[in-house]
Amino acid sequence: IETMKKLYILTVLILLTGFGTAFAQTLKGHIYDANTNEPLVGAAVTYKLHGNQGVVSDINGAYEIKLPEGGVDLVFSYVGYEDVLMPMVIGRRDVITKDVYMKESTKLLEEVVVSAGRFEQKLSNVTVSMDLVKASDIARQAPTDITSTLRTLPGVDIVDKQPSMRGGSGWTYGVGARSQILVDGMSTLNPKTGEINWNTVPLENIEQVEVIKGASSVLYGSSALNGIINIRTARPGLTPKTRFSAYVGVYGDAENDEYQWSDKSFWKDGKYSVKPILRGSLLSGIRNPIYEGFDLSHSLRIGHFDVSGSINLFTDEGYRQQGYNKRFRMGGNLTYHQPDMGMKILNYGLNVDFLTNQYGDFFIWRSPTEVYKPSPFTNMGREENNFHIDPFINYVNPENGTSHKIKGRFYHSADNIVRPSSGASITDILGNMGTNAQTIQNIAGGDYSSLYPALVGIGSGLINGNLEDAMNGVFTSLGNIFPNATTADYCDLISWVMDNGLPGDLGSIQNGQLPSDLIPWLSNVMNPSRNDSKTKTDKSYNYYLDYQFNKKWDGGAQITTGMTYEHVRYDSSIMDEIYKSDNVAAFFQYDQRFWDRLSVSAGVRAEYYRVDNHYREAETKILGTKVPFRPVFRAGLNYQLADYSFIRASIGQGYRNPSINEKYLRKDIGGVGIYPNLDIKPEKGYNAELGFKQGYKIGNFQGFVDVAGFYTEYKDMVEFQFGLFNNADYSMINSISDAIRMLMDGKGFGIGAQFHNV
């Protein structure tokens, strides 16, 4: 028995020794980009022996792999690069050093995107319609902001600064974008309004833009109702890089002389709202409106740090009156790559951005013959300053196929509405309306008797309690005083009255008397002592935290899951109130790759949302039971029919929560009011599509054809209604008669907009 034990132990030792020497051979080295010589982090080195065996490169691009004695076929692969096949013959206990240089793939469908699934994958494998724009494509267009480039994409449009995909946006000016806009995966939408200010996008430091068309709320939440636009910024390489550009443009005269709103002396007289730096020197000889811009960016690596920064200065006098824009943007990134992590990858850092911005909002034209002049009801511009700091940490463990990502944000914004112009004076308005020079001179001299008939016309009807007679009386009187008045002129007059107010003693008209304070009121408005061009400053604060976990298996399966929390505080100086909102969401997505041809994806999201004490903003019915959160789903597949031929199908749900401005805010914007409506419900919808993509190459010319058929349905879309509103309860006034009755009762009303579901 003892002899048997010795033989058994000896056999085990021999086997263990043989097993150890079988994989005692080592291949090591670095993996580089063949063009830039930069190390490729996370590149895979694999071979087949009883299944796939392999390792990945570390933060320095280094790899080390144990190989069996004899010959193997090694494959070096990296997303977005061409595979390198390396036959290798290695002797017992050999240690071989071999550096590998990989070429970036020049095939369009091999390009890498992250937006479709929150992880890197080939463009050809995504299950949704997606466009990709590289930095070189943007540079060739030399845009002043990214909207000029986005307009060139099929199915994408920018209507009054709002993004629209496949016609999916209604017309909610200044609030509630229905497409989510991201910079490096972080939303750039204003927390309180839900709108996009394109000046926040760092045009000077873009690597690529990824555009997904169709509902994408499962991974990106509210506002991804139409899709998403993800701007990915460039990161430093081994070689320091500095980029500077300067540009200038000149607007031509309007083709129709009636449309011309400026003349050749505007710049000298200081009538433009903003002044470009070169206007008073190099460009002083140009008489037409101009724009200019300067971009500067620099990036480099210092030890284990990635450092980048950029500055942008842009000034645009505007081809439309009140269409000006002036911005100064400064931002940067600092990333630290933790050394001595072996094959694991750990990096952390922060992004910082600051923007100060002045711009005009051209909302409604004054008249069909004055299309470049704004309506007096929309005499508004904005001054805005915002700052955000975004810390992050990323950890990747290729050994077990897991990754953890944490992103945060602190955001602060201060903005106010300004009046770019003081508006027409009462004498100018009367002159345009055809009032004779003597009447205007009398009014300017303090004789207001010519205006009495209009007020008496109202009173004659009110004495008898007949509002229709009152209106007929006033229109008859006004027709005599203003023989040449157009609708636009009356709008000027109404806007002027809204700005300067009315006599306080209007109730005396019902007794057939003129207001006792008519003369002091007229004297004050003819010689105004105030010119407050700004409203009070509103402030908003945003706190955001996002955690994402990803797990990959060798069989081609992977999951992406995580949670998001966002808190918004909005201090409204106009309402003298503070609004607070909280948003909590959890998401899960499963992706599987079969036979290296079929990609399948499915995901779900649940989101809770509240504003102040409105705790059930996301309330939904599930099987007849109300729950305080909203679930959404998506699914898709992509199948490779042949080389560079792909067919895809997908279906997804989307939603958009009304912004604080849409639902809760009362605000005056250039004479026009925004009125709250607590009955607004969230928008929701879904998108289903079937698509086919075919790549081609003819000589050095390559591209692809992408055809998609889709069906989109939306419910409870939010649109605004324009009209007269009761300033007390915010209800809409249905007739002029009701408005006059309110005035006679000493109650105020306003002109403005209110949002409703349609």
Task: Show the residue positions of the predicted features.
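Outer-membrane beta-barrel translocator/receptor signature
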Residues: 190-192, 205-207, 218-229, 235-330, ...
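Flexible loop and strand-edge segments within Gram-negative outer membrane beta-barrel domains
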Residues: 316-331, 335-396, 410-430, 532-541, ...
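Short acidic/polar hinge/loop motifs at secondary-structure boundaries
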Residues: 64-66, 186-213, 234
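Short, acidic Ser/Thr/Gly-rich low-complexity loop/linker segments typical of extracellular
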Residues: 50-62
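Outer membrane beta-barrel strand-and-loop segments of large Gram-negative receptors
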Residues: 526-548, 677-681, 687, 698-758
